Structure formats: C-alpha cells, structure tokens
C-alpha cells in the first residue's frame, strides 16, 4: 500500500536518517513527497514526477550513485576550502599579534593582505572546487545531519598547520628585527615566504581527508595547476614591480 512506503520513510526520518526514495507510479507519490530526496523515473507517471525532487531521465540507478559521489566530493572540497582559509587567517592573526609584542611595524601591509585574500577567496576556491570527484568517498559511512562541517580532524589540522606556519614566520620576523635588521629586502622576503607557505598549503588542502598523496594524478588537475601558476606569476610580478604600493623591492639570489 502507498501508506506503507510513507510510514517507512517517516520512521527512518525519526531515527535521524536521510531518506531518498525512487518510484515511477502514482502509488509512490506520498513516499516521494515525504522523503528528503524524491527520485522519479523518466518513464514514470506525471503524478510521481510532480511529487519528486528530481527525475532520472535515463531511468538509470547509476545516475543516483554518481549524484551521491559528486555530493560527497563537493562536501569534502568545501571542507578543504575552509581548512585552507582558516589556516591563512590563523597565521596572519597570530603574526599581527606577535609582531606588536616585539615592537615591529606591521609585517604585512594592507595591499599585501589584499593579494593574500585574493589567493584565499578566489584562487583557492577555483582550485579546490575544480577537483574531480573521488571514488573513495563512496566507502565512507553516511554523515549525520547534526555533524559540523569542521570535524575534530580538520580542527586539529587547522591548529597544527597554523601554529607551524606562525612559528616559522614569527621566528623569521624576530631574526630580522633583532639580528639582521628590518630592511625593504627583508620585508619582501618575509612577504614572499608567507605567500609561498599558502601556496604549499593548497597541497595540504588537496590531500585533506584523503589517503592519497596530494600529487596523485597531479598533472590531470588542470584547474589546480592553473591556479598554482597564477599565484607564482602574480607573486613574481608583485615583487618585481610592486614598489611602494606593495612595499616590495626586486630580489636577487644574493638577497
């Protein structure tokens, strides 16, 4: 009976399950309507199609598997993007606080941070969103609806990587301030190393949540390759031509 299918859907939902229902007949309409995701077949009745959220035009259940794979992969890519952004923010925030404690001027200028934000908000989104879906996500258990997108593993990764980056940059800043003296060349080196750390962090983000190396099928990730090249080229242009606007001076090997 149609009500039996609907009761099953309601019972599963009460237990916190995310329920998807497929159907092609009029009697499937109540279950399709009450499910979180209703999937009707292209050859089904108009009643079933109207009650569903989407229609499988090719009547192929493999399309459902592909949709789940893409959904899980997109969720993971969003986690990677959040990880990348928060690592940059944690590092920059601690550097500003640390720099004020040792009495140095702002280690990063406003225009330099605008370039870093462009890397974070635009280029990183392009690179990480363009990563292809991974087959290994289908082996994972379904997430609970109450799960926070930043899980414990990601939170620890953000803290550890952010502190490592801060420790390296703060040590460099302290050396320039107390030993070598802060000059335009030193500040340019500091800024470039900071950007290169975020450039490398894209590889950390790519491998986040995966058992595979960040270099797995590296050459096939054209979107990531393009973004990595743009960041390198942009940083080179800023160092060579930025001048007073970016508080940079051209660097050579001796510097």
Predicted regions and their residues:
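Membrane-embedded transport module
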Residues: 2-20, 35, 42-210
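Conserved Rossmann-like nucleotide-cofactor binding loop
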Residues: 27
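Basic, alpha-helical nucleic-acid-binding regions used in initiation and control of genome expression
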Residues: 32
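C-terminal membrane-solvent junction of multi-pass transporters and transport-like membrane proteins
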Residues: 149-150, 154, 209-230
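Hydrophobic alpha-helical transmembrane segments in multi-pass integral membrane proteins
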Residues: 165-174, 229-245
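Extracellular/periplasmic helix-loop-helix junctions in multi-pass membrane proteins
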Residues: 179-182, 240-255
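Hydrophobic alpha-helical membrane segments
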Residues: 196, 201, 223-238
């Amino acid at each position: 009976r149609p009500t039996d299918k609907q009761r099953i859907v309601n019972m599963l939902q009460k237990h916190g399950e995310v329920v998807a229902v497929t159907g092609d007949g009029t009697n499937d309409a109540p279950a399709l309507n009450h499910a979180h995701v209703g999937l009707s077949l292209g050859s089904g009745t108009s009643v079933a199609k109207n009650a569903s959220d989407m229609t499988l035009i090719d009547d192929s259940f493999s399309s459902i598997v592909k949709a789940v794979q893409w959904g899980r992969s997109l969720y993971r890519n969003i986690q990677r993007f959040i990880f990348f952004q928060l690592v940059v923010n944690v590092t920059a925030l601690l550097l500003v606080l640390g720099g004020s404690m040792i009495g140095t001027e702002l280690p990063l200028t406003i225009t330099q941070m605008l370039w870093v934000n462009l890397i974070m908000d635009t280029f990183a989104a392009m690179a990480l969103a363009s990563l292809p879906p991974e087959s290994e996500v289908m082996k994972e258990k379904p997430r609970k609806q109450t799960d926070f997108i930043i899980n414990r593993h990601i939170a620890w990764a953000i803290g550890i990587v952010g502190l490592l980056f801060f420790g390296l940059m703060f040590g460099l800043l302290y050396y320039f301030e107390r030993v070598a003296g802060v000059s335009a060349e030193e500040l340019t080196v500091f800024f470039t190393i900071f950007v290169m750390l975020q450039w490398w962090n894209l590889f950390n983000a790519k491998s986040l949540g995966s058992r595979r190396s960040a270099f797995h099928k590296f050459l096939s990730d054209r979107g990531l390759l393009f973004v990595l090249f743009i960041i390198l080229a942009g940083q080179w242009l800023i160092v060579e031509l930025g001048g007073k606007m970016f508080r940079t001076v051209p660097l050579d090997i001796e510097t």
